[in-house]
């Protein structure tokens, strides 16, 4: 127990150990190596008794991590409502913000802690309209995750539905609404043929006599004759009912009206009985245009005025016809109007449609089927536009918005945390690539050769090291899959010819592929993911990260947009990607999260680097125009100013990451010094042979020589920097590089960051870059002096920037 610190005991809920440590006078505000306080661990774990003990001993209730997260953030992340209550009772700030501008309410929503979020809103009085650094309110976050109960609670407590985030999106723009195929289409009921067949069935149920047949034949002959002579008079002669609306007559037939709309005939039967004469039946409830359209549908199954209109017009007339059909229980007419209105709903008229719908009686609205649903879905999906309309400002209130969300609740799917991610656009990738230093391009003759080798180099230098020995060359063994290596110009001495041929084939294939997620691309992407699942190194990426179960409570402090292979596979299976770019962005996001959160020396970091490199290489081979982005190391974590004691404790530890980083960078490229290369003079040749032997042995030596090499690297770096600066300022001829200077440059290359190593390899003549097995080798003696001068200039610039950053 003596070896257990207070933060450790609080993290694991060791109540008795905490009591013992507090009895010994342990400082309740001591931080661990991650700069988190004991109260953080107790809060996220839900150990309320430990929280109470710490607060009673004077724990800082609003203490924060380097990223600004307080114990209240941690309790909200874990859904620990009791701990939240206790912290707020002890004056915790319910609206405190972390480094990303997130309040505890935002944090609870980011972790899908629905009950906790509702408690913060309704019980603890959290401000529902505060924004994160990305401009998202709690309503944005709840909507993106499909958390209907939280959305309703937010709206009831004053959340604004028209506020926009930094991307100019209103909250409901990202509301996940999913409809099945059966819900998307609704069959129109009671076709004309069905209705007319009912009329014919009446004749089938009676015995036909010859007289009846003759009468029928005579009628048919009369109708045919009359239609041929004068169609206009046929309506009057053979119609048996006439309506008078606004002093205009409409002719009809009782049998057809009875078959098509029985309830309408029932409503006028009294008038027919009272009016034995042939006087027209007066209709006062409807306009002539409306009633004529009603009769038109009864006879033709369509309304000409409907067919000639567009989405932009006022649909009040169509609603009037629909209500008329609903009143007389004419299901076919209701279905016809409903489908027409559904197809006519657009961004410009959805507000006016909703204004009409919400005024309808509840019984009528229930008979509108999917029309109400489709109207609400269109309204929500065009929320950015709708919030700027006059209808929104004049006719929509808080209760309306709540009703909208409740009505859509059955179709809103709660989105898993792992699927919530930041949209990463091509502009962001372009911005990242522009920020990296780009050396002067070579002439067109070398650009051709540079095409394919550059692809190999990129993946090599972004590959994590899975060392099976101390040799740096073995570290890149897993960088290039065996299948893909056969298609690249590896193991070839004639690099130029193989590269140029590959370049031409690449350019021809690039014009034959589409970036849309068609069946061919979907099959390829599924193959990539299934291949990753089979690798043992992918176990850590196959499911979403559980911070509590895995003992990493700060995971969501660092990683705001989680992603995993299981989620990606699910989206592929459900056609969740529209383009290959979206798919690749998710895969890279998953591995970049691992590289950001984990230490360079950890197995997870190395596995992530290996898998990311393999993915980029295979993806690039299949989609030559989809260049992988330039991966930048994450920015350093901001830390508070340490005390004198902390500075003394950290003195010894700060040197370790530096040396580890150097060793890591040394493993990125295996540099080969060719002992058989021709040298300018015999003396230099002898000297080279000796030096090459030592260099060759050092490249495969054990880790015991790393410290000496690093010291030599520093000395050589200084001398080379001085010589290069004096040379550039005093000489006009090309500098000649000695063997020692070439080795010095080689050592300095290995000290660079991975991205800088990539740029160096882009500068070097591709003929000097060779691939042996699955590792890269640079022959320093095949690089001419002019090319070396470019390399040295870039290296000096990199070290200068590193010193400025320090």
UniProtKB/Swiss-Prot annotation:
NET domain location: 727-806
Molecular-function annotations in GO: lysine-acetylated histone binding
Ranges of Polar residues composition bias in the record: 676-693
One BP term from GO: chromatin remodeling
PROSITE patterns: ANK_REP_REGION, ANK_REPEAT, BROMODOMAIN_1, BROMODOMAIN_2, BTB, NET
Chain residue ranges for the region called Disordered: 210-231, 423-517, 621-743
Compositionally biased intervals (Pro residues): 626-641
Chain ranges of the Bromo domain: 516-622
Superkingdom of the organism of origin: Eukaryota
Entry GO CC: chromatin; nucleus
Positions with biased composition (Low complexity): 426-436, 443-511, 642-658, 694-733
Residue ranges of domain BTB in the record: 239-307
ANK repeat ranges per the UniProt record: 1-30, 34-63, 67-96, 100-130, 134-163
Keywords, comma-separated and alphabetical: ANK repeat, Bromodomain, Repeat
Basic and acidic residues biased stretches: 210-228, 666-675
PANTHER family: ANKYRIN REPEAT CONTAINING, ANKYRIN REPEAT DOMAIN-CONTAINING PROTEIN 16
Name by which UniProt lists this protein: Ankyrin repeat, bromo and BTB domain-containing protein DDB_G0293800
